[in-house]
Amino acid sequence: MLVTGHSGQSLEWIAANSDGWIYYPRNVRVQEVITEQWRKILQATSSDDKPFSQSFYIDLVEDKDALPIPIHLGYRLGRNALLEILCELHSIGVNHVVFNLKYGSRPAAEVLDEIGEYVLPHFLPQNPFSNSICHQYLA
């Protein structure tokens, strides 16, 4: 069971009673503080490492180099900017990102095909973080 937000519970309760935590999208620096708090609480409660996840609204445009423009709880952006943001999130301890295409301007199937072909391969287990495209974004 993953807890979304705080669901009326303390972070200690979530760490002890859930299989992970889904939180809301935040600025990367703010999210880094939140993921650090999550890991500290897990250690303090002697809990196993549990995933930190977040939602992320995207409008993936056809221009792969389009810079991010803020939308509600996410961005309108090209796939290269999406990759860069996902690399940043990965580097601060976000384990899973839940994409929401609600504000998308393209057909969902087309967006999912593009993500599957150009984005997800960089995050497969056989493609370690240090050898992936993330290395160039975070260098």
Feature map (PLM): residue ranges:
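Active-site-adjacent structural elements that line small-molecule/cofactor binding pockets in enzymes
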Residues: M1-A139
